[in-house]
């Protein structure tokens, strides 16, 4: 990859590309004002075929952001070069990939560059215009106030905010949200695929960035890695913006890969959190419950098959044994599930790092 810094360029056609009003805090500080001394904020904007919208997005990024990092993920339309030639913002840095790495790979490259630039908080927003840069102040506030290590947008807080969401996308988000709750352990977090996120740099540094998924599963995989590191995640209400942009995410292509990745993360999370990091009564509930359910299912299934094959009704004791072991195992797993829901990280990591 290559790094470019912006040069002084002509303003956008028909628009005054001026940062002065925003640096005076009159426009983009939204309804909340941030203490700039609290942290240096870098905004990472991954791009792939977003030449039509990227400049409008960059123009709306306010003075609370010290660095703007545009990552050209080998765009066939040369988005990075376009931004470099048209944007005169002195905060701009362009990172160019020679090969496409996916939205996760582009975001991680932006993280790396933001760390090099000395950022304290890294915000990620897409270049398609669906995320309002004027909400950056709201997004980073839980981190600046020491209430969270990672903050993410949630489009489902306000029902009127999702009225414009396409129906298939709405259904898909509900399904993916539940799957992410199970696999990541953040049971109170919703809208996991939302790409409007912020993370404290100290937390980003302890994550295995080279192991995080680089595809569209990136946001969900981030939640898994944050949980096994016991990071606090906050949901921030945001409004979604839907236009005529084309989504690169195809449900038919991600259904099975996402299901497998969620299952893999679930198994790894349970092993790490309940066997390696801690072994408690909840661990016993999990292990014994799984064994009893497996025994009840297999034992009952074998005897049911023999009964059907031979025409001889299984004895009452066999039926009761299979039912009791399965039921007791289910009770234990429900107890474990209740513990897991309550076991979300509560104390932010970064103040102690």
Predicted features along the sequence, with ranges:
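Acceptor/aglycone-binding surface of glycosyltransferases and processive sugar-polymer synthases
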Residues: 95-116, 121, 133-216, 243-253
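A conserved acidic beta->alpha catalytic loop
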Residues: 72-81, 99, 129
């Amino acid at each position: 990859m290559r790094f470019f810094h912006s040069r002084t360029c002509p303003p956008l056609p028909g628009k005054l590309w001026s940062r002065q009003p925003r640096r005076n805090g009159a426009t983009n500080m939204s309804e909340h004002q941030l203490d700039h001394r609290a942290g240096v904020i870098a905004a990472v904007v991954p791009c792939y075929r977003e030449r039509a919208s990227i400049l409008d997005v960059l123009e709306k990024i306010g003075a609370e952001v010290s660095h703007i990092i545009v990552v050209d993920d080998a765009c066939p339309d040369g988005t990075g070069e376009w931004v470099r030639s048209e944007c005169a913002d002195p905060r701009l840095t362009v990172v160019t990939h020679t090969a496409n790495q996916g939205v996760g790979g582009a975001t991680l490259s932006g993280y790396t560059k933001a760390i090099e630039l000395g950022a304290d908080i890294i915000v990620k927003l897409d270049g398609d215009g669906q995320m309002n840069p004027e909400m950056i102040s709201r997004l980073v506030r839980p981190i600046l106030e020491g209430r969270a290590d990672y903050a993410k947008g949630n489009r489902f807080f306000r029902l009127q905010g999702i009225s414009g969401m396409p129906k298939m996308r709405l259904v898909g988000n509900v399904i993916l949200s539940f799957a992410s709750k199970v696999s990541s352990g953040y049971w109170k977090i919703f809208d996991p695929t939302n790409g409007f996120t912020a993370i404290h740099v100290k937390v980003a540094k302890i994550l295995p960035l080279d192991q995080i998924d680089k595809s569209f599963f990136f946001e969900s995989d981030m939640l898994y890695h944050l949980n096994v590191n016991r990071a606090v995640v906050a949901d921030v209400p945001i409004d979604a913006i839907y236009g005529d942009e084309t989504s690169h995410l195809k449900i038919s292509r991600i259904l099975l890969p996402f299901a497998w990745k969620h299952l893999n993360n679930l198994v790894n999370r349970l092993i790490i959190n309940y066997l390696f990091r801690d072994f408690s009564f909840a661990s016993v509930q999990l292990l014994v419950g799984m064994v009893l359910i497996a025994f009840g299912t297999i034992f009952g299934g074998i005897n049911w098959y023999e009964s059907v094959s031979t025409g001889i009704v299984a004895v009452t004791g066999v039926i009761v044994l299979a039912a009791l072991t399965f039921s007791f195992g289910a009770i234990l797993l429900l107890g474990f599930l209740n513990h897991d829901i309550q076991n979300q990280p509560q104390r932010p990591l970064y103040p102690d790092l």
